[in-house]
C-alpha cells in the first residue's frame, strides 16, 4: 500500500505525463480497490442480481439537479448541491412523504425480488455472491466518493518536495520512455545536495499552506451545504464537542 501511495503522489505531480507512464506499462495505474479479487464464475450471477432502490433524498436530488443546472448554467457543483440540500430541508413533510413512500414501495419490491433470486442459488453461490457484492460495493463506493469530491471541488492534497521536483524536471529529463524519464528524475533527486533540495522543500511547505487554507474554505462550504459527512475526522470531532473548528 505504501508503494501505491508513493506512485499516486508521483503521478499526481506529473498530471498528464503520469498517465503516459501508466500507458507505457500497458494500462492506467488502478486504485488500490481495483486489485480486490472477484470470482469470475459468479459475474453473471451478480449481473442478474436485483439492484437496491435509491434513497428518498437521492431521488429528489436527481430530479432537481437538471432543473437547477438549466436555471444556473454557470453555478459550481457545490453551489447546486447546497441549493438542493436547502430546498430538501425546507420541503414540507407532506411533499417529502411522496419521495419516502416511493422509496418504501421500491424497497418492498426489491426485498421480494432478492428473496426469489436467492432461492435459485446454492449455498456456495450465495456465500460467493455476498462476498462479490461486498467487494464491488467497496470499490464502487471508493470510486463514487472520489468522483463526488472532484465534482465538489475538494482541494488537491499538498505535494511533497520530491513531487514538486518531478513536476518541474520530468519533461526535460533524459530518457526515451516515460519510465526512463522518471528513473532519471529520481536519480537526479537523490544526487541533489541539501541546499539544492531546500527550494523544493520550501515550495512544498507553501503548497501545504495553500491546501490548509483551501480546505478550510471548502469545509465551510460543505457544512453550509449540509455535507458534514465530507469533513475531516478532526473537524468532525471539534464540532461534536463544541470546540473551535480551526
From Swiss-Prot:
Per its UniProt record, what Gene3D superfamilies does this chain match?
A: High mobility group box domain (1.10.30.10)
| SUPFAM superfamilies recorded | HMG-box
Keyword Mitochondrion listed? The answer is yes
The record places the DNA-binding region at 50-118, 155-219
Tell me, what's a Pfam family for it? HMG_box
Tell me where the transmembrane regions lie: none
Answer whether the UniProt record assigns the keyword Transit peptide to this protein.
yes
Provide the alphabetized UniProt keywords: Activator, DNA-binding, Mitochondrion, Mitochondrion nucleoid, Phosphoprotein, Repeat, Transcription, Transcription regulation, Transit peptide
Q: Which PANTHER family match?
A: HIGH MOBILITY GROUP PROTEIN DSP1, TRANSCRIPTION FACTOR A, MITOCHONDRIAL
What biological function has been recorded for the protein in this entry? Binds to the mitochondrial light strand promoter and functions in mitochondrial transcription regulation. Component of the mitochondrial transcription initiation complex, composed at least of TFB2M, TFAM and POLRMT that is required for basal transcription of mitochondrial DNA. In this complex, TFAM recruits POLRMT to a specific promoter whereas TFB2M induces structural changes in POLRMT to enable promoter opening and trapping of the DNA non-template strand. Required for accurate and efficient promoter recognition by the mitochondrial RNA polymerase.
What domain comment accompanies this record?
Binds DNA via its HMG boxes. When bound to the mitochondrial light strand promoter, bends DNA into a U-turn shape, each HMG box bending the DNA by 90 degrees.
Quaternary structure, per UniProt, is:
Monomer; binds DNA as a monomer. Homodimer. Component of the mitochondrial transcription initiation complex, composed at least of TFB2M, TFAM and POLRMT. In this complex TFAM recruits POLRMT to the promoter whereas TFB2M induces structural changes in POLRMT to enable promoter opening and trapping of the DNA non-template strand. Upon metabolic stress, forms a complex composed of FOXO3, SIRT3, TFAM and POLRMT. Interacts with TFB1M and TFB2M. Interacts with CLPX; this enhances DNA-binding.
Q: What is this protein called?
A: Transcription factor A, mitochondrial
Native organism: Trachypithecus cristatus (Silvered leaf-monkey)
Amino acid at each position: 500500500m505504501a508503494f501505491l501511495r508513493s506512485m499516486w503522489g508521483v503521478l499526481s505531480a506529473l498530471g498528464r505525463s503520469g498517465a503516459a507512464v501508466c500507458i507505457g506499462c500497458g494500462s492506467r495505474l488502478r486504485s488500490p480497490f481495483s486489485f480486490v479479487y472477484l470470482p469470475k464464475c459468479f459475474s453473471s450471477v451478480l449481473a442478474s442480481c436485483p439492484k437496491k432502490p435509491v434513497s428518498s433524498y437521492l431521488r429528489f436530488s436527481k430530479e432537481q439537479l437538471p432543473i437547477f443546472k438549466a436555471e444556473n448554467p454557470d453555478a459550481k457543483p457545490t453551489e447546486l448541491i447546497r441549493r438542493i440540500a436547502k430546498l430538501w430541508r425546507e420541503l414540507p413533510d407532506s411533499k417529502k412523504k411522496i419521495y419516502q413512500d416511493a422509496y418504501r414501495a421500491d424497497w418492498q419490491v426489491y426485498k421480494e425480488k432478492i428473496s426469489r433470486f436467492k432461492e435459485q442459488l446454492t449455498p456456495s453461490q450465495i456465500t460467493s455472491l455476498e462476498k462479490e457484492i461486498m467487494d464491488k460495493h467497496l470499490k464502487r463506493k471508493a470510486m463514487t466518493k472520489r468522483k463526488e469530491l472532484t465534482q465538489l471541488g475538494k482541494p488537491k492534497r499538498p505535494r511533497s518536495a520530491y513531487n514538486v521536483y518531478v513536476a518541474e524536471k520530468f519533461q526535460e529529463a533524459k530518457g526515451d520512455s516515460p519510465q526512463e524519464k522518471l528513473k532519471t528524475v529520481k536519480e537526479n533527486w537523490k544526487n541533489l545536495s541539501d541546499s539544492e533540495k531546500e527550494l523544493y522543500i520550501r515550495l512544498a511547505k507553501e503548497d501545504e499552506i495553500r491546501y490548509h487554507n483551501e480546505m478550510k474554505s471548502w469545509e465551510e462550504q460543505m457544512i453550509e451545504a449540509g455535507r458534514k459527512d465530507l469533513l475531516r475526522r478532526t473537524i468532525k470531532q471539534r464540532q461534536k464537542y463544541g470546540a473551535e473548528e480551526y
